Amino acid sequence: MKLKKILMESNVWDRKFGEKLPTLADVQRKFEQKKLNEATRWSVGIEDPNGKVTSVYGHYDGYPEYVGKLLKKHFSNPSLVKQLIKLGKSGISTLGKKIGKKHDFDMPYDEKEKLGYTTFYGRDRGEGGNFTQVSKDRTQIKTNSGEEFLYIWSVKDKKWYYKDEDWPNKRWEEL
């Protein structure tokens, strides 16, 4: 049953009667294509004065024009960043203008936008696990989930920085 679910989620289950099942490689390839088209993944972290970075995963709309803009405008405060990371330990689905209250994960996007709430996989969908990453410094941050953009609040500088992972040699830039 688990295999069927994976095949359905990867859009390879839709086949005509009598057709061969796809290979594992076919399923993985299709899943990766879907994953890349589905979301602009990102991570958000806080850098302490010694350079240590604590970060969590974010799933949708990770572009600087959206997540970057929201972080700079609404989360330029270390206590808010810490709260975002604490609640985001199981991941952040969508970033809003504020942390907001617990709400139905499947609430229509327009309603979430109107309320300005951030949607968390743990708080709002009940997912467990702790995917918080602690890195010695910025250079040690790992992108294990296909994150395209990394965002860090520097406690020392009191500024947001970001990096586009599609350009590995690119330096961190101020938002």
Predicted features along the sequence, with ranges:
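Short, flexible beta-strand-to-coil junctions
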Residues: 46-51, 59-62, 144-145, 153-157
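Catalytic phosphate/metal-binding cores of nucleic-acid and nucleotide-processing enzymes, i.e., regions
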Residues: 46, 55, 63-66, 80-81
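A short local loop/turn or secondary-structure capping micro-motif enriched for an aromatic residue
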Residues: 62-66, 169-172
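Charge-dense, intrinsically disordered terminal/linker segments
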Residues: 1-39, 49-50, 101-102, 136-139, ...
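His-enriched metal-coordination microenvironments in redox/metal-binding proteins
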Residues: 35-43, 59-65
